[in-house]
């Protein structure tokens, strides 16, 4: 009788797959320092409000904008670093060849979904950036600060989704090349 070894799940790929992934990871690491800036400006707000009884009008919206922007970028970072969510119950239980086909399905479905989201986000960003007559007019928050953060976030969502579509295309090409190379052997 042969002794069976328990199946060990695959380790996530630690290396970016292409130049775009490398750039996203590098830029994301730099932008992650903005989380610290958010902590500092939030601390500033607490000090001003509770020690000097002089609350700010800009900290809450600015901190929310920075945090929201970083979370949007976090989506393309997770995909670039291969840290996205997958159903490991199925993925880890199948052979490496089957994983390649699951990756192919994942990239096809993801490409379709990201493309539809990018298309939808375009109309939201366009409405947030331009008046109905075509003049540039950024949507603002409507608060005392009245910053153009809503328009900037909608534009960032559109850009991030366009990048995600490109990522899916590049990853799909790599998956197809990997299948072709395996089938040729």
Model-assigned labels for residue ranges:
Residues 2-185:
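Alpha-helical transmembrane segments and membrane-interface helix-loop junctions
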């Amino acid at each position: 009788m042969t002794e069976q070894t328990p199946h060990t799940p695959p380790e996530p790929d630690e290396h970016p797959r292409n130049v775009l992934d490398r750039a996203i990871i590098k830029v994301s690491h730099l932008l992650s320092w903005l989380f610290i800036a958010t902590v500092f400006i939030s601390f500033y707000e607490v000090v001003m409000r509770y020690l000097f009884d002089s609350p700010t009008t800009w900290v809450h919206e600015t901190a929310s904008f920075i945090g929201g922007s970083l979370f949007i970028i976090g989506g393309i970072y997770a995909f670039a670093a291969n840290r996205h969510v997958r159903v490991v119950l199925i993925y880890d239980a199948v052979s490496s060849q089957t994983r390649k086909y699951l990756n192919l399905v994942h990239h096809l479905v993801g490409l379709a979904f990201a493309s539809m989201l990018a298309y939808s986000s375009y109309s939201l960003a366009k409405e947030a950036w331009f008046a109905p007559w075509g003049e540039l007019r950024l949507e603002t928050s409507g608060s005392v600060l009245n910053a153009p953060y809503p328009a900037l976030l909608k534009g960032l969502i559109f850009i991030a989704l366009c990048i995600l579509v490109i990522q899916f295309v590049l990853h799909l090409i790599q998956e197809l090349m990997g299948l072709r190379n395996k089938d040729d052997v």
